[in-house]
Amino acid sequence: MSQRMQQGQPMIILGEDSQRTQGKDAQTMNITAGKAVAESVRTTLGPKGMDKMLVDSGGSVVVTNDGVTILKEMDIDHPAANMIVEVSETQEDEVGDGTTTAVVIAGELLDEAEELIDQDIHPTTLAQGYRSAAEKAKEILEQNAIDVSPDDRETLVKIASTAMTGKGAENAKDTLADLLVDAVLAVRDDEGVDTDNISVEKVVGGAIDNSELIEGVIVDKERVS
């Protein structure tokens, strides 16, 4: 038995067609893969952003300009590219919006890093610089952040409405924004908001404008004829 197996380290067997890259070639391939992912959603960003039509192997069609939706529908195998996808997923889970912006910024950082590497700046130095820049950016954001009171309903509705822009629910965002704010305030306590206490149930029939907030329990029963 090999020493690596004795130490509990996994042994990975690669296929015959596998290729191994290292050094500058590996850096270039990883950066290129990450930039390609960012480029795929770049044109969906902003007020003039365009929708993407995605067709899967089964023929299903999805039309959206939502970054995380687009990236989830794409078949991505490259490890570095998948790290960029994880950026969008983390942004979606933590904030619920800004996924495309996060991916585009990551792509720009990779682009700048590539230029600096070409100038023989060591990747470790770049990583340290990016960490310092992230701390400074966080500091500036905290200085410019505005506290929003739970009683400031107008601002809360605007925030919810903005988060739906460019998504499937955009046509009904005025109605849904009010519902969302009501739902969040209903489960708010001194420790914050536990979104697990909010359940979204879909019912066949009707329009999205028929959505309503039920502060209680829903029992799915067929109508008696």
What are these regions (language model features)?
Residues 2-6, 10-18, 26-32, 43-93, ...:
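Long, low-complexity regulatory segments enriched in Ser/Thr/Pro/Gly and acidic residues
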Residues 21-28, 117, 121-124, 163-171:
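Generic amphipathic alpha-helical segments used as scaffolds and interaction surfaces in large
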Residues 35:
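Structured ligand/cofactor/substrate-binding pocket environments in proteins
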Residues 38-41:
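Alpha/propeptide regions of enzymes that mature by internal proteolysis
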Residues 109-120, 154-164:
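Acidic/polar active-site rim loop that often engages polyanionic ligands
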Residues 138-225:
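Long, structured protein-protein interaction/assembly regions in large complexes
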